[in-house]
């Protein structure tokens, strides 16, 4: 792993790790959305679980769309940035605008489509930033480690933030802002031309 911190790779390694961590941190916070719907919106637990399930079903198409767009229309870096920004806008609408169950379903579905869908190209983008002999190490550090830390800390952070600031501000701080910051971090990474991948 120390080779990733040599001068040639350090900046790229840290940017990828930080971007991935922030993204996973925000994603991890959304694991508590059922609790948000039952506490902040006072929904029945069955309705809260249903809307999460339906939205994840919609989100599955986001993975496919991101893969197609990242492979054939845009480069992967730009797909991640676009999907993250669209996902953050939908997240804002989910928390601050949507009121009815149907409105929530639409914007939550859009959030999962874009925000979660970016993961279809993120791992590949991390790997293609490094030569073949470093890809497994880079993917484990800047990818898997960052994801596990984010998934672990995100739910803890939203429970703390919701208790201290309320659910809407909590999700703004712990969910929405980290997605936008991750998108900005990915902007600092150079696009990888397809011919340089292999």
Cite the ranges covered by each PLM segment.
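Extracytoplasmic gate region of multi-pass secondary transporters
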Residues: 8-63, 151-154
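Helical-face signature of the major facilitator-like transporter fold
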Residues: 19-20, 24, 107-113, 144
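Hydrophobic transmembrane alpha-helices of Major Facilitator Superfamily
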Residues: 25-29, 60, 101, 113-121, ...
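Helix-to-loop junctions at the C-terminal end of transmembrane segments
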Residues: 64-75
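C-terminal transmembrane helical hairpin of 12-TM major facilitator-type secondary transporters
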Residues: 76-122
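Multi-pass alpha-helical transporter architecture, strongest
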Residues: 125, 175-198
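A late C-terminal transmembrane helix in Major Facilitator Superfamily
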Residues: 127-164
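A membrane-interface helix-boundary motif in multi-pass transporters
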Residues: 160-177
């Amino acid at each position: 792993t120390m080779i990733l911190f040599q001068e040639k790779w350090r900046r790229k390694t840290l940017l990828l790790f930080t971007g991935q961590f922030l993204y996973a941190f925000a994603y991890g916070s959304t694991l508590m959305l059922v609790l948000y719907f039952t506490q902040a919106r006072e929904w029945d637990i069955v309705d809260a679980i249903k809307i999460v399930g339906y939205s994840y079903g919609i989100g599955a198409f986001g993975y496919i769309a991101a893969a197609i767009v990242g492979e054939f229309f845009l480069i992967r870096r730009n797909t991640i940035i676009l999907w993250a920004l669209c996902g953050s806008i939908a997240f804002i609408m989910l928390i601050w605008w949507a009121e009815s169950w149907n409105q929530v379903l639409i914007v939550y579905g859009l959030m999962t489509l874009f925000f979660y869908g970016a993961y279809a190209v993120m791992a590949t983008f991390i790997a293609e930033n490094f030569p073949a002999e470093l890809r497994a190490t880079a993917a484990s550090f800047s990818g898997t480690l960052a994801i596990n830390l984010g998934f672990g800390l995100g739910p803890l952070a939203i429970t703390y933030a919701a208790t201290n600031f309320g659910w809407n501000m909590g999700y703004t701080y712990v969910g929405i802002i980290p997605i936008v910051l991750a998108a900005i971090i990915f902007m600092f990474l150079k696009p990888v031309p397809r011919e340089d991948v292999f």
